[in-house]
Curated annotation (Swiss-Prot):
Record-annotated site: Role in the control of polyamine-mediated channel gating and in the blocking by intracellular magnesium: D172
Summary of the function given for this chain in its UniProt record: Inward rectifier potassium channels are characterized by a greater tendency to allow potassium to flow into the cell rather than out of it. Their voltage dependence is regulated by the concentration of extracellular potassium; as external potassium is raised, the voltage range of the channel opening shifts to more positive voltages. The inward rectification is mainly due to the blockage of outward current by internal magnesium. Can be blocked by extracellular barium and cesium. Probably participates in establishing action potential waveform and excitability of neuronal and muscle tissues.
Organism: Rattus norvegicus
Ranges within the bilayer without spanning: 129-140, 141-147
Protein's UniProt name: Inward rectifier potassium channel 2
GO process annotations (BP): cardiac muscle cell action potential; cardiac muscle cell action potential involved in contraction; cellular response to mechanical stimulus; magnesium ion transport; membrane repolarization during action potential; membrane repolarization during cardiac muscle cell action potential; positive regulation of potassium ion transmembrane transport; potassium ion import across plasma membrane
Expression by tissue: Prominently expressed in the central nervous system. Also found in other excitable tissues such as heart and skeletal muscle.
Subunit note: Homotetramer. Homomultimeric and heteromultimeric association with KCNJ4/Kir2.3. Can form heteromeric channels with Kir2.6/KCNJ18. Associates, via its PDZ-recognition domain, with a complex containing LIN7A, LIN7B, LIN7C, DLG1, CASK and APBA1.
Membrane disposition: Multi-pass membrane protein
Family designation: Belongs to the inward rectifier-type potassium channel (TC 1.A.2.1) family. KCNJ2 subfamily.
Principal location listed in the UniProt entry: membrane
Lineage of the species this protein comes from: Eukaryota, Metazoa, Chordata, Craniata, Vertebrata
Source taxon at top rank: Eukaryota
Length: 427
């Protein structure tokens, strides 16, 4: 009789439980075994939403309120604006009420509330709680109407005026600092940093590559921009421990430095699927039946404030398009470059993309088709060039050296010089 696991993250305590978890892991193509069962599983809950928010809830946190109050400044910066305004108003009103009560007690103990008393009062014209409250407001806000003022009759009253002035300055500094820090947060900068809706896998420089596109909608630059990516999936260790979210780094050029990007126009981030890649053994069929999530991160400093911002998104396995490329968005004109963001999320299919894994491709188990086939990006670039020439009055055909039997497509299919694997805008 198998044992029951009381904790979903505990060590597997029996062979039966181990077989159950092994079946779960093998089903999505990431088990420890060599066989893969291609059965479509229910998609996992997204760990990072498309807008960058983490889909995580914290429960059973001990002394949560005390911990948040201990770091009250960060708490005020992180909370919503409506709660910030509530704290702003309460801080001033409570301080006015507190010192108003103090001045009223001083007047009460000194006998200033007795109208028949003719001796000098501690605070002139303070003969009720309302008057004491108004004097407190005038002192802390330095209004000074002139009717109510402290005298030298009571040293304690003089001390309280000085003390309230200091407390008022502290409250002003704290509130203004929190509001300015909240306004200067680079969080809203992420609204103008966009990731493509889908990632793609296609051939680039003779190798299978995972690619996604990132763009900056503002003209202001993102200083020291760099990208990172991680693959999240569940796995079982050799000791039988079930890890629900194992994080594996995806190399996007950290060693060579090409993870640092100049984000002026949309850029395609490229991950070469080599022997060190977690996608090395996955074919198109494996991707279609896999259950994992790729988290992509863009970091940099906001040019206006020099504060670091981080933009996040993620791609599930069913959001990766095998055999697709992104449509070009950057077009060269006479005096400038233009970016067409209506094409930012669009892809087109590349029919000759191998369906096997990168391992099988590296081991020559798949024969590639002619690499010099006419490319869609070349067609778009040539079409744009022809339109520009026609607008300038240049004849469409100006070359007389080409043989009559060779068309434009064959001319465009001349092999180009191999270029190093770098992420760039595709023209």
């Amino acid at each position: 009789m198998g044992s029951v696991r009381t904790n979903r993250y505990s060590i597997v305590s029996s062979e039966e439980d181990g077989m159950k978890l092994a079946t779960m892991a093998v089903a999505n193509g990431f088990g420890n075994g060599k066989s893969k069962v291609h059965t479509r599983q229910q998609c996992r809950s997204r760990f990072v939403k498309k807008d960058g928010h983490c889909n995580v809830q914290f429960i059973n946190v001990g002394e949560k309120g005390q911990r948040y109050l201990a770091d009250i400044f960060t708490t005020c910066v992180d909370i919503r604006w409506r709660w910030m305004l509530v704290i702003f108003c309460l801080a001033f009103v409570l301080s006015w009420l507190f010192f108003g009560c103090v001045f009223w007690l001083i007047a009460l103990l000194h006998g200033d509330l007795d109208a028949s008393k003719e001796s000098k009062a501690c605070v002139s014209e303070v003969n009720s709680f309302t008057a004491a409250f108004l004097f407190s407001i005038e002192t802390q806000t330095t209004i000074g109407y002139g009717f109510r003022c402290v005298t030298d009759e009571c040293p304690i009253a003089v001390f309280m005026v000085v003390f309230q002035s200091i407390v008022g300055c502290i409250i002003d500094a704290f509130i203004i600092g929190a509001v300015m820090a909240k306004m200067a947060k680079p969080k809203k900068r992420n609204e103008t940093l966009v990731f493509s809706h889908n990632a793609v896998i296609a051939m680039r420089d003779g190798k299978l590559c995972l690619m996604w596109r990132v763009g900056n909608l503002r003209k202001s630059h993102l200083v020291e921009a760099h990208v990172r990516a991680q693959l999240l999936k569940s796995r079982i260790t050799s000791e039988g421990e079930y890890i629900p979210l194992d994080q594996i780094d995806i190399n996007v050029g950290f060693d060579s430095g090409i993870d640092r990007i100049f984000l002026v126009s949309p850029i395609t981030i490229v991950h070469e699927i080599d022997e060190d890649s977690p996608l090395y053994d996955l074919s198109k069929q494996d991707i279609d039946n896999a259950d994992f999530e790729i988290v992509v991160i863009l970091e940099g400093m906001v040019e206006a404030t020099a504060m670091t911002t981080q933009c996040r998104s993620s791609y599930l396995a069913n959001e990766i398009l095998w055999g697709h490329r992104y449509e070009p968005v950057l077009f060269e004109e006479k005096h400038c470059y233009k970016v067409d963001y209506s094409r930012f999320h669009k892809t087109y299919e590349v029919p000759n993309t191998p369906l096997c894994s990168a391992r099988d491709l590296a081991e020559k188990k798949y024969i590639l088709s002619n690499a010099n086939s006419f490319c869609y990006e070349n067609e778009v670039a040539l079409t744009s060039k022809e339109e520009e020439d026609s607008e300038n009055g240049v004849p469409e055909s100006t070359s007389t050296d080409s043989p009559p039997g060779i068309d434009l497509h064959n001319q465009a299919s001349v092999p180009l010089e191999p270029r190093p694997l770098r992420r760039e805008s595709e023209i």
